[in-house]
C-alpha cells in the first residue's frame, strides 16, 4: 500500500508545491522510497525527476539530480529539458524534415535550423496521467495526437519509474501507434553526483567510463555528419576511466562544435536490444558512483555546456558544466540516415526500451 499520509520526505519537497491544474489536468509529486530510505521524486509534468536522494561514502544523503522544488519553476525553467522525459523524438532532426513512405513531414523548428527533443512543446512540456502503484513505482501515460509538432500518427506512450532496494532507478518505456511514424524516447537526467549546492560543483573531476568504441561526429548545428568514427586517439575515448574535464576543452573540431561533449556514443553491443553496460561515473570526493545500463544502441553524453548559474531546488545554483547527462536513445537524425538503427514504429508493433541508473558508493 502507498503511504498517503507521509508528507516529510528526505528530499525536503512537498506534494502541495507540485499540485496545480493545467488545461484541466492535475499535476502532483510522486516520491519513490526503497527499503534503505533512499528516494526518487518525480512530477507528472514532463515526467521530470526532481530529486534522487542517495548517500555518500560517509552515509550522508544528498540530492544528486538537478531540478526544481515547485511546479511553477519546473514549468518556467530556463532549462526546459531539466531531468525530464523527452519525446516524440529525443535529440535533433535536421531542418525538422524527414520522409516516410515517400512523403515529407515538416516538424516544429526550435534549435537553430533543426527540431530538438520533439519540437516547441515536446513530451517534457505535457501533463501525463499518473498512478503510483506502490512505494517503489509510478506509471505515467500520455497520448500524443496525430499532427502534434508535425509528427504523423497518434502515439500512446507508457513510462514506468521504479526504485529498487539496490538503488536502481529503472525506467521502462513502451509505445504504440495507429499509423506508421517515428519515435525516440529518452530521459534527460542532469546528474551532479557531488550533490546539488550553491554553487553546484563542476563535473571536471568526475571519473567517467563509456562502453563505446565509436561515436557520431556532428556539424556546427549538432547534426550527425553521417560518419561513425573510432574514439581511439580522440577526446571521445572513455573506454578506460578518465576525468570528464581532461579533454573537455581540447583543441578539437568536434569539441568546438559541441562546446564540450554533446555527442552520441555508439554503445558496444553483442546483440541488438540487449540490456548491457553503457557508462559509469564516480565522484571522487563523495565516493558516489552511477552505472548506466540500457537496451538502446546509443547514449548522448551532454556536459551542461550552456548553463549560466540558474537556480534549482532549495537555493542551489547550476553553473556551466555542473551536471552530466547520459541520454540513452537511438541516434540523432536517424530518419535521414537509412543505415542508422531504425526509429520507425509500425501500427502492428510495440516500441519498448529499458534504461537503468544504478547508484552506489566506492570508498
What residues fall within each predicted segment?
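An exposed, glycine/acidic-rich loop-and-rim segment of catalytic or binding clefts
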Residues: 2-363
